[in-house]
Amino acid sequence: MSDLFEDPAPARNTPEYTVSELSGAVKRVIEGEFGLVRVRGEIGRVSRPASGHLYFDLKDDRAVIAAICWKGQAGRLSVRPEEGMEVVATGRMTTFPGQSKYQIIVEDMAPAGAGALMAMLEKRRAALAAEGLFDAARKRPLPFLPRVIGVVTSPSGAVIRDILHRLRDRFPSHVLIWPVAVQGEKCAPEVAAAIRGFNALPDGGPIPRPDLLIVARGGGSLEDLWGFNEEIVVRAAAESRIPLISAVGHETDTTLIDHAADRRAPTPTAAAEMAVPVRLDLLAGLDGQGARLSRCAAETIRRRDQRLRDLSRALPRLDSLVAGPSQRFDLWSARLSGALGQSVAARRARLEPLGAHLRPRLLADLVARQKDRLADRGRGLETCLGRRSERARDRFEALSGRLAPAFARLVAESERTNRRDAAALGALAARLEAAPEARLLRLADRLEALDRLRQTLGYRETLRRGYAVVRADGEVVTTKTAAERAASLEIEFQDGRLTLGARKPRKGKAEPPAQGSLL
């Protein structure tokens, strides 16, 4: 009775798997069924651990797929994955048995469209501009003659060669190159590190600190130039204490580093032209300024000499200043002596009639008193005349003393001016004498450089690389037909010429004579 209520035995035809076997089977099915796939979605939850691998999600409105990009492939991606970016990822589907999930191993990645990439770029530009990183007030003037120029670019390629060649032609300068990757995952961190590294160099250190920086790269697509739109690069350019020129892409290409840089150059060659002036133009300007300075100095000396001569003619002579007062003094002295004689004679004439009526004694007393009075007056007049004469002489001597130092100062000032102008003229003459010699040296250096260029571009340099020149009758043979028709050939090698033996020139096949008519 109890057998009727026993459970039926489980079926034995369903295969039994271990967990590892089932996970491996699922892994083989997924990898074999899908293989290489392209998935379009939005990037979310980006993780960059110290191992260098990239872990992120690809999602849409209804599902999420885990994605992995190994370290070796992450550095070759054309764009840097960021959260919110819409991309098309190419890779292989696989599973991770340890967590029972499927995932895609990304091998390549591209933006889902130029419109999406431009929208993200515009959003980033607006955010950085709102912080003031692109303000014109932050931009600094470029140095006129930078002593050291730092270049951040790839060490190989046409960009660095164009910059060095242009700098060498215009004004040779000391150039420091910081090699970086200009495309891919490593581009942005290496460029930012190079800008900050140049700014960290100390003044007076073993490596000279640049006076100007150039960040350069050739043209490319928006994805190729994306590293220069990264926020880390823009912030490094804005924080640079060294003036910076951005020369990324062609004239039509614009990246965010162009807005943060102090100057933007349309091409790397134009950046070199912005960095330094033309040396020959500066030398020509200096020669012109030297000539103008010489003319101005000569004209200044001539005008001052003429003014000195005019002042010398206008200044009265010392003899003429003293002659008038001295003559008046002599006249007054002569008049005073005559006046004294006349006064004595007049008084004697008045006294003689009176003396005739006086007694001799009284007359003698009167005469004695008058004589004493006259003697006193004479002494008083003599003293007064002496004092007036001394005062007049002192006044003349004081006037003469004031005029003599003034004249001496004027003469000394004129001599100092002449000596100073003569020294300046001598220095200018020395510079003018040295200018032709310096110009001859510059011309000799330029001639030597042109001769080296001529030797480099000459065909004899080509002969040294294993080529040869074939001539026939003095003309260069360039075709096989001309060589076959030549009577002899002369071959020029690096170390001499070789003449091949004469031979008869090949003739074209003669046409058979036409058969004559029997009629």
UniProtKB/Swiss-Prot annotation:
* Described function: Bidirectionally degrades single-stranded DNA into large acid-insoluble oligonucleotides, which are then degraded further into small acid-soluble oligonucleotides.
Record keyword Translocase present: no
Q: What's the EC number here?
A: 3.1.11.6
Subunit-structure text: Heterooligomer composed of large and small subunits.
Its recorded reaction(s) are:
Exonucleolytic cleavage in either 5'- to 3'- or 3'- to 5'-direction to yield nucleoside 5'-phosphates
Stored NCBIfam families: xseA
Q: Which InterPro entries match?
A: Exonuc_VII_L (IPR003753), Exonuc_VII_lsu_C (IPR020579), OB-fold_nuc-bd_dom (IPR025824)
- Which GO terms label this protein's molecular function in UniProt? exodeoxyribonuclease VII activity; nucleic acid binding
Q: Which organism is it from?
A: Cereibacter sphaeroides (strain ATCC 17025 / ATH 2.4.3)
* Protein name, entry field: Exodeoxyribonuclease 7 large subunit
Q: Which UniProt keywords apply?
A: Cytoplasm, Exonuclease, Hydrolase, Nuclease
Gene Ontology cellular component annotations, sorted alphabetically: cytoplasm; exodeoxyribonuclease VII complex
Subcellular location(s) per record: Cytoplasm
Concerning its family, UniProt says: Belongs to the XseA family.
| The organism's place on the tree of life at top rank | Bacteria
Coarse class of the primary localization is cytoplasm
Q: For this chain's UniProt record, which GO biological process terms are given?
A: DNA catabolic process
